[in-house]
Amino acid sequence: MTIHLISFASLLHKQATLRSSHEAILSELEKYYTVKLVDYQDMDKLTSDDFKIIFIATGGVERLVIQHFERLPRPAILLADGMQNSLAAALEISTWLRGRGMKSEILHGELPAIIQRVHILYNNFRAQRSLFGKRIGVIGTPSSWLVASLSLIHILTLPPKR
């Protein structure tokens, strides 16, 4: 199970120190997943089958992230460990994304809670990927005694595989 962390860090922050600066969260993630740090400039090399999290490593990256808005994974899962003002940047970015109709979520807080949420998001991602290309349908109509179910009937359209 691999997580691709698309890292955004301030130009003032040396890329070489990114790992050591965020050792606590990266080590915890590596207990459960293979973690690959991907520079934001290389995010186009990832495929639609790769589970991606946007890693806000420092503050001061808000403009950089929005410049790459079209290339960001959807929904946007933002990971911020609070180091180097990353949480403030993640909050700004999330607000901007939501203002443009893009779903986003910030992962921040106690490490066990972050890991638990990543597990859920990863499993949801895998389930959604397994449904792409599948034909899903309902045969017949609900029985008349299922009065609440009648209002829930609708056609489910899955987005095309990216």
Predicted segments, located by residue:
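Glycine- and other small-residue-rich loops at beta-strand/loop junctions that grip anionic moieties
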Residues: 82, 107, 141
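Metallocofactor- and cofactor-centric catalytic cores in central/energy metabolism, strongly enriched
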Residues: 1-91, 98-100, 116, 120-123, ...
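Conserved anion/nucleotide-ligand pocket segment
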Residues: 126-152
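Glycine-rich beta-alpha loop elements in corrinoid/cobalamin-binding modules
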Residues: 106-115
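Conserved small/polar residues in nucleotide/adenosyl-binding loops
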Residues: 153-160
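Solvent-exposed, charged interface segments at domain starts and junctions
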Residues: 44-48, 148-153
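Conserved thiamine diphosphate
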Residues: 95-107
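Beta-rich, aromatic/charged-enriched effector core domains that present basic-aromatic interfaces
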Residues: 110, 121-127
